[in-house]
Design a protein with these regions (language model features):
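Conserved acidic, metal-coordinating active-site core of Asp-based
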Residues: 4-121, 130
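Mg2+-dependent phosphoryl-transfer enzymes with acidic/Ser/Thr/Gly-rich catalytic loops
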Residues: 92-177
C-alpha cells in the first residue's frame, strides 16, 4: 500500500500507536491539523520504509478525484483492505474487519451488552457498518445518504442538537410523546 501510494503521489498519513506519521508538512497536513486539532509527525522518506504496523492509513485526495481514487483502491486491494471515508477527500484504509462497529461491539461485549442493546450515531461513510449493525442505528440529518439508508432513526443535524435529542428521546421515552 505504501509503495502504491508513493508511486501514485498520494498524500498519506500512517496511524501508529499515539502518533500520526507523514512524509512532510504541507497543505494537506495543515488542513488535517486544523480540522482535527491533532498534530502530525514528519519523518521524511522513512514513512515508506517504517517497521511500524499502522492500524489505519489515511489518503487525502482532491475532492474531484475522490470517487475515482476510492474505486481504484477498492478494486486494487479487494479482500486485503477495508476502504471507507470520514470526509469527502479522506480515504481510510484498514485491515479487513477493522471498523467502528467491531470496536463498539468488542467494548460492549466486555460489559455484557448485546448488539441489540447498542445505540450508535453517525454521519459519514466510516459509520455505515456501525449504524447498520447497532440495535438502534441513528443518522443525523446532515449525514451521507449511505448512512441514512442504513439507519433506523434519522434525527436532526448534529448542528441542531440532533445527537442530544435522540439520546434524550431514548432515555426518556415520554419526551417523544
Amino acid at each position: 500500500v505504501l509503495a502504491y501510494c508513493r508511486e501514485k503521489g498520494y498524500y498519506l498519513q500512517l496511524y501508529v500507536g499515539d502518533s500520526i506519521l507523514i512524509k512532510q508538512e504541507n497543505d494537506c497536513s495543515r488542513m488535517y491539523t486544523k480540522i482535527s486539532g491533532i498534530q502530525t509527525t514528519a519523518i521524511g522518506d522513512a514513512l515508506y520504509h517504517t517497521d511500524e504496523e499502522p492500524y489505519k492509513i489515511l489518503v487525502m485526495t482532491k475532492s474531484e478525484e475522490f470517487a475515482e481514487v476510492w474505486q481504484q483502491f477498492k478494486q486494487d486491494f479487494a479482500g486485503k483492505l477495508d476502504v471507507t471515508s470520514s470526509k469527502d477527500n479522506f480515504l481510510e484504509l484498514m485491515e479487513p474487519g477493522v471498523n467502528k462497529w467491531e470496536a463498539v461491539k468488542s467494548v460492549a461485549a466486555s460489559y455484557g451488552v448485546q448488539p441489540q442493546e447498542i445505540m450508535c450515531i453517525g454521519d459519514s461513510n466510516n459509520d455505515v457498518k456501525m449504524i447498520a449493525n447497532a440495535g438502534i442505528g441513528v443518522a443525523v440529518a446532515n449525514a451521507k445518504d449511505s448512512v441514512k439508508q442504513n439507519a433506523k432513526i434519522i434525527t436532526a443535524s448534529n448542528n441542531d442538537d440532533g445527537v442530544a435529542m435522540v439520546i434524550e428521546s431514548i432515555l426518556t421515552p415520554q419526551a417523544a410523546e
